[in-house]
A protein has these predicted regions:
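A short, flexible N-terminal coil/short beta segment enriched in small residues
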Residues: 2-30, 134-135
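Structured catalytic cores of large enzymes
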Residues: 4-12, 42, 49-136
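Short, charged N-terminal beta->alpha structural module
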Residues: 20-47
Length: 136
């Protein structure tokens, strides 16, 4: 499944720090695959595909032990149960109860919206002024 050979790093993680998970429905859609490929190029990520849920890639995640996981998915395939299950998956890579990677969902109204989200995240958001509503 891997696109390249992986070496074990000093931190105990194999291969890359970044993994992209996406559905086979996204794989069949050229516009959405541009989003996947942009993430792959930007982060040197491995990409894994699933039929129904990211849980199908748990063995791959256990092998790679990524630090970051991005899920590229069409909005109609996302729901409450999807997110809850992903929270569980993020804690099942090893034996302890803690989250094993940071994860997020890249989506949009359409593939162009998802790509715009990706493009706008290139630079970190810096807050220069803020108003606090907490009184002491």
């Amino acid at each position: 499944m891997s696109s390249f050979a992986q070496k074990k790093k000093a931190n105990g993680r194999a291969g890359g720090e970044y993994v992209v998970l996406t559905s086979k429905a996204v794989q069949q859609d050229a516009a959405w695959m541009q989003v996947v490929n942009a993430l792959k190029e930007k982060h040197g990520a491995e990409v894994f595909f699933y039929e129904k849920a990211p849980r199908e890639n748990l063995v791959d995640l256990q092998r790679v032990k990524p630090r970051y996981v991005a899920i590229v998915e069409k909005p109609e395939n996302l729901n409450r149960d999807y997110v809850i299950d992903m929270h569980h998956v993020s804690r099942e890579v090893d034996e302890d109860i803690f989250a094993d990677f940071l994860w997020g969902i890249i989506t949009g109204y359409d593939a162009n919206g998802a790509m715009k989200m990706l493009d706008n995240s290139t630079e970190p958001l810096v807050i220069k002024n803020a108003v606090a509503t907490i009184t002491e």
